Amino acid sequence: GRRGGVAEMRFAFRWDMSLPPQEFYKEANWDFVMCVAMILLYTRERWIEPMYLPKLPYSLLYHQTMSWLSSQGSVKPQELARYILTLGVFRHVSKEDYLLLLRHMLENGQIERGEDGALLVGDKGEAAVNNYEFLAVFSVPSEYSVRCNAEEIGTVQTPFPEKAQFALAGQAWEVTELDLKERRIFVKHIPGISANMWQDTGNEYVHTKVMKKIQEVLRSDEEYAFLDEAAKKRLNDIRRACRNAALSTSSVISERIADSAPGFPGGKVVQITPTLYTVFPFLGTRACMALMYELRQRGFGANVWLHRYIPVCIEVKTDRSLAELETALSEIKLHGADKYTFRIPDNCEISGKYNDYIPRELLRKQYVEDYLDAEDMQRNL
């Protein structure tokens, strides 16, 4: 705002209305709805999404270990652990896990053991520490070439795994092969538009309170004063589409729509095809991921469908009946889930600048601990 005037902030959203018809949830611009929800949370409840502090920041642990060794020259293992593990950010890291990391670093030449038993930066570690980018904790984005046959379509900064779908150059693509060494992603064209599949960097979290407010916005008929006429119309269109699918009302039941099962008050199960259902639990990222894995544990082919980084729903591909899916959701609500028993794919990890120097066992442990929240899932399902 000008001096003496009222400050004003405007949010603009672009949506291509000429896209071909798709499932109702793929036609909604959820970032717009989430923006409405977050404005309401702040203006009416004075609530903003809290920062999530990871419990097991192993990439940062590597960085601080190398920084300390570089500054000290050589340090006894006990002294190193005593200093590093007393830093507040590492209070959840066990001595056993730190010992595992140090052994891995020794095996890979990042650090070496001196004649007196002290640890010092190794030959390979010197290359990392002396690089000017080492001063930055965060990674410098890498570009991956996206190719369809022999033609380069463009570049992305995310190494999408095989079968992942994403949008680029105005079209949708599915990954057929990933070459990390050459930084190439081979794809095939698919119809429609795509949002990234459930595998992502693990760094973008949406809070469950935000998702519940999104559900509230969809259920409401209120016209918000901060929306202009075009935005009001767009929100009403999205509300109407969701209600037609029985997503946001509890009284609509048809042959294609399943109302909430007993003990499952969170959202709706919508049958898209005879073998495809969508579950709308309105859970935050970490809770929604936990629900996806628990459904997989129970034999359902589940994937979180993301709009950008917003966990809109879980797509369930199965030959099993709607009643079986509803029963499973009711049981999950009643009994919860043990995230430490989930079968996590080997390529799943929370992105970190120094993940290449971290044992796979620790990266998996970090993913389970910091990217899955079974308690929040059960509490808010």
Question: Predicted regions span which residues?
Answer:
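Conserved segment of the helicase C-terminal RecA-like domain
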Residues: 1-53
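Amphipathic alpha-helical transducer elements in NTP-driven molecular machines
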Residues: 3-6, 29-36, 59-62, 77, ...
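Terminal, basic amphipathic appendages of nucleotide-handling enzymes
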Residues: 4-8, 12, 129, 141, ...
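A generic structural motif
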Residues: 10-12, 119, 183-188, 277-280, 301-323, 338-344
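C-terminal accessory/connector segments of nucleic-acid motor ATPases
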Residues: 46-161, 165-172, 177-178, 271-281, ...
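Short amphipathic alpha-helix segments
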Residues: 249-260, 280-302
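Short, conserved charged micro-motifs
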Residues: 286-292, 319-328
